[in-house]
């Protein structure tokens, strides 16, 4: 930062960038300032100018985890309903800024699902199956990592069944040797700190498998297992290598009640 000062002349503060707090403070103290190429604020000189720059959404090839969670929530629980940002925020706990970004992502990749009425954006899914089929190419596995763990006496209640264990519960797929459970990434850290399990270096020493998810599986679940859409996405890679898993996923999709 540098200050231009000439005796008996107005002072103009020049800075490459300024925070919102600094700009507000300068405005309150009536200090003239300029951010080259962006803003000029010198009311005593009769000079006020700014360049309005709207940051475009980054072109994405896939939804962010939060946007994916909201889209799946709409597909599973809000079919044929108009959902605005307030409803999304209340259901998910996401901030207004995050919800606005999510609306932008969905509107960019699936514009037919987003409409505007009186300045308010809504998500409305008329044909859930068609929306799912079109959205799949933008959706990713929610699983960030899988851990082989050994239970302790502090094993928590209420974990959602996931992975092959969830597939086996609703299809002809045989149950795996270890149960799989889904946990939101933020909760995983807490449960690990509470010594609910121990991470094992060798799979044969483990009693269970913990899937760490990029969004909260509880948001979308309506039972003891993770939701069917996230389940299919989480097992995509396994389905490519194992025809039994592929057949089980196809069965889950066929049984969906759109």
Question: Could you describe each region identified by the protein language model?
Answer:
Residues 9-30:
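Nucleic-acid nuclease catalytic cores
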Residues 196-258:
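Hydrophobic alpha-helical interaction segments
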Residues 45-69:
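Short alpha-helical segments that sit at the start of domains
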Residues 30-42:
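Charged, structured surface patches that assemble and position nucleic-acid processing machinery
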Residues 67-131:
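Loop-centered beta-sheet repeat module
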Residues 138-213:
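Short gly/ser-rich loop at a beta-strand->alpha-helix junction or flexible surface loop bordering the NTP-binding
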